[in-house]
Amino acid sequence: MKYLKKIFVLVISVLLIAGCGKDKLPGNDKREKDKEAKKLQIVDESKDTRSYAVMINNNHQAWPHAGLQESYLNYEIITEGGITRFLALFRDSIPEKIGSIRSSRIYFLDYAMENDAIYVHWGGSKEAYSDINSLKLDHIDGMDYEGKYFFRDKTLNRAYEHTGFTKGSMLKEAATALGFKTTSDKGLLLNYSVDEIDLSKMDGALKADDIEIEYSNYQTTNYKYDSENKVYLRSMSGEAHTDLVTGKQYTAKNIITYQVKNSSYDSYGRQELDNIGSGEGYYISNGYAVPITWEKTCRSCKTVYKYKDGQEIKLNDGNTWIQIQPLNKVLDITGNKENSNNNSSEE
């Protein structure tokens, strides 16, 4: 009987050892690594962190910018004088120098709201302030908090209005102190794919190695495809768009571009944007562009982007620039030289 008990204990021990070692088999390790590799990199989908939407100055005298490569989503939109401004969205990764920061304009509020973001600006037009108050937007204003949640970089050889910056730690401190919620249940604006999307096989695909997006005589934005790294190198008005801190040229994984009507409403040339409605545009990634549609039904409603077959677009894993152009400005999407005659678009 004792002999049988010993055999029974021995068998059970072997089975337990085998079971404990199951997860350490080479095949299982590979599967775990593959599973981890499929995790979305541009944002952490497992968290419900609320974004910050920061107004960025794009007057040429304010170049270079700081911190924009860590923005997962950027909008570029026309303002008065043919100058553009950016709205840079930060979520999981917020750098310690962002800027330079500029004042608010009314239609930028729409894009902060569609992302359920805390709005960050340094001053604003009277119309923008009126809307911020009436819409009860959570916002952090450099006019109120210079020296506390915003700072001046006086080492820069720039006009004073181009020297305003903030940093991630300051924004988080401000949000807590001002009692803003720091999580969001609204979800991301855009849908992303952990698997690489090949746009070349889609209907209407254009080769897209070089992209020219005209805003005015003052401002043109260009992208050039880097096939080795599968990103677009960003330039503006003939100059590489570089970072003040790193010196590196900014890149984009995804580009969405479309056109809306704009008009001046005051003697300063401040703009109104006819951005509630629908229209057509392009989604560009990995060297190709495909035609899409866009629709925004209210100021706080999310803009919905769809392929021509009616399916919502999915983006490659990486940062995105949304280029909202004035109507009737040049949009040129060009392929490599041998295909350039067939693969260009001008609107």
Descriptions of predicted regions:
Residues 2-25:
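Sec-dependent N-terminal signal peptides of Gram-positive bacterial secreted proteins and lipoproteins
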Residues 27-71, 75, 80-347:
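A surface/extracellular/periplasmic glyco- and lipid-processing/surface-interacting theme
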